[in-house]
C-alpha cells in the first residue's frame, strides 16, 4: 500500500513540476514559418547584394536611410575619439552610406559568409544574430558577431538596425 501512495505522490509531484515549468516559460512568440522564411530570404538577399556589389539594393532592405548601421567600437577607440569629442557615444553616425559606396566602387571580390544563424520573430518584430566572416578576394578580412533588428511594415520585412563586432 505504501508503494501505491508513494507512486501516486510521485506522479502528482511530477505533474505539478511539469505544469509549473510550462507556466514559467511564458507566452509563446507570435511566430510563423512564412515570416521566418522571409527573414531568412532577406539574409540571402543581403549576402547576394554584397557579392554583386549592389549597394543600392542593400539600402532598399533598410526601413529608412537613417537606420543604425555600425560596428561597435572598442573602449580604446572610444577613448581615442573622446580626445576630440567628449560626448562621443561609441557609435557615431550610420555607416550605411559608406558601405553602399564601398560596394559600388570596390574592384575587389567581396562576400560576407554567415554561420550559426538564429532567427527569432514575435509578430512584427524580428531579431537575427549570426557569426560572420567578411571576405575580400577569397581571404577573411575580419569576423565577428552581427545582430539585426527587423520590423514588418506594409507586409514587408525591413531592417531597423545592424550592429556588429570586428575582430
Report residues per predicted region.
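Surface-exposed, charged secondary-structure patches
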Residues: 82-137
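Short, solvent-exposed secondary-structure junction/capping segments
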Residues: 48, 60-79
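A mature extracytoplasmic/lumenal domain signature
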Residues: 62-65, 73-74, 118, 130-134, ...
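Short, low-complexity N-terminal intrinsically disordered segments enriched in polar/charged residues
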Residues: 22-61
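Short beta-strand edge/turn micro-motifs at domain boundaries
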Residues: 25, 127, 142-167
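Sec/Tat-exported extracytoplasmic proteins
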Residues: 43-54, 62-66, 100-103, 107, ...
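Bacterial N-terminal signal peptides that target proteins for export
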Residues: 1-10
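Bacterial N-terminal signal peptides
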Residues: 9-19
Amino acid at each position: 500500500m505504501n508503494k501505491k501512495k508513494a507512486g501516486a505522490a510521485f506522479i502528482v509531484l511530477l505533474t505539478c513540476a511539469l505544469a509549473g515549468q510550462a507556466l514559467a516559460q511564458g507566452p509563446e512568440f507570435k511566430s510563423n514559418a512564412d515570416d521566418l522564411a522571409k527573414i531568412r530570404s532577406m539574409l540571402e538577399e543581403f549576402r547576394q547584394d554584397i557579392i554583386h556589389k549592389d549597394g543600392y539594393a542593400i539600402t532598399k532592405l533598410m526601413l529608412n536611410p537613417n537606420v543604425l548601421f555600425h560596428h561597435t567600437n572598442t573602449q580604446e577607440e572610444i577613448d581615442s575619439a573622446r580626445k576630440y569629442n567628449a560626448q562621443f557615444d561609441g557609435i557615431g553616425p550610420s555607416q550605411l552610406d559608406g558601405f553602399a559606396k564601398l560596394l559600388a566602387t570596390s574592384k575587389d571580390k567581396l562576400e560576407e559568409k554567415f554561420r550559426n544563424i538564429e532567427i527569432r520573430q514575435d509578430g512584427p518584430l524580428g531579431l537575427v544574430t549570426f557569426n560572420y566572416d567578411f571576405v575580400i578576394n577569397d581571404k577573411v578580412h575580419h569576423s565577428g558577431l552581427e545582430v539585426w533588428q527587423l520590423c514588418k511594415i506594409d507586409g514587408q520585412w525591413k531592417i531597423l538596425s545592424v550592429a556588429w563586432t570586428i575582430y
